[in-house]
Amino acid sequence: MRVLAIDWGEKYVGLAISDPLRIIAQGLDVWEIKGEEDFVSRLKRLVEDYQVKEIVLGYPISLRGHENERTQKVRHIAELIESVIGIPVKFVDERLTTMEAEKVLLEGDIKRKKRKLLKNKQAAVIILQKYLDSSSLDT
């Protein structure tokens, strides 16, 4: 049973997928956001191709724990995914994941232009690994 993670950005969506044993997260793709309908259609195909049974969505709240406009957008996307695709969506606190992703990409000596494109995918990996690690503690 695979888990898919989504890091919803302003222009791009980062995607990461777990291995079938739900131990390791790996980066999958970065999609340009071209509207909700396009996103859900592409996501539905991805869910079928990878036999995803659970989706984790980065939950953007401020460092002080307050919700904002992006939080509302992410909630809306979660509701859309659940209603159209029929897979439960769980939220994972994504505070500082973009900064952590940027650091990983810098350490990997990735060029600035490519870093900008890859940071959402790397953030999705961090979100998913955080979720997988916390799930393994529950069992």
From Swiss-Prot:
A Pfam short name: RuvX
Group of enzyme by EC: hydrolase
Record Gene3D superfamilies: YqgF/RNase H-like domain
GO biological process, one term: rRNA 5'-end processing
Entry's localization field: Cytoplasm
Keywords: Cytoplasm, Hydrolase, Nuclease, Ribosome biogenesis
InterPro entries: RNaseH-like_sf, YqgF, YqgF/RNaseH-like_dom, YqgF/RNaseH-like_dom_sf
GO cellular component terms given for this protein: cytosol
EC number assigned by the record: 3.1.-.-
First-listed, main subcellular location of the protein, grouped into a coarse class: cytoplasm
GO MF annotation, one: nuclease activity
Similarity comment: Belongs to the YqgF nuclease family.
Role description: Could be a nuclease involved in processing of the 5'-end of pre-16S rRNA.
Protein name (Swiss-Prot/TrEMBL): Putative pre-16S rRNA nuclease
Source species of the chain: Dictyoglomus thermophilum (strain ATCC 35947 / DSM 3960 / H-6-12)
